[in-house]
Amino acid sequence: MYKINYHMHTTFSPDAENTPEEMVLASADAKIDEICFTDHFECNGNSSIPEGFTPWPEFQLDKYYAAISSLKDSPICVKVGIELGQVTQNKPLAEKVLASYPWDFVLGSLHNLSNQYDFYYIGLQGVDMRPLMRDYFEQLYELAVYNRFSVLSHLYYPVKYIYRQGRAFDLH
């Protein structure tokens, strides 16, 4: 079996702790044949992070691409990708990022609704889940129609936080 992982974040993303080099070595140790780094690039900037929380640093696109590209001669196959979040909230920026480099793989993600915080930060007690999820799937559909990525990721992203907060939700 050929083992791959195409959704990996490094220290270029604020939600990860390992360098690209460390992740290549760990992947090789785990007998993974091929990986693709897809660090976060949020097209809506820090607008989805509430005041009082640490804002994400500006993504260093050139530095990121150079660092990952330098690993192409690793003991395993290494691809250069990116996770574009909230593409439809800033299509001109998304287009600029997509045109910047010959990406091997692009994830399209939706971590927050337009003019809302990332679901990670939202308190959902007392919130009616049906309209929230309807809005989410409508915006996810808009992202799917945009169709400038390899894979649409996190299809049920809000559900993770709904359950984490002890709420139940039936998608049917």
Which sequence ranges carry the predicted segments?
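Glycine-rich anion/phosphate-binding loops
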Residues: 15-22, 89-94, 130-138
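Short aromatic-enriched loop/helix-cap "lid" or pocket-rim segments at secondary-structure transitions
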Residues: 48-49, 93-94, 119-120
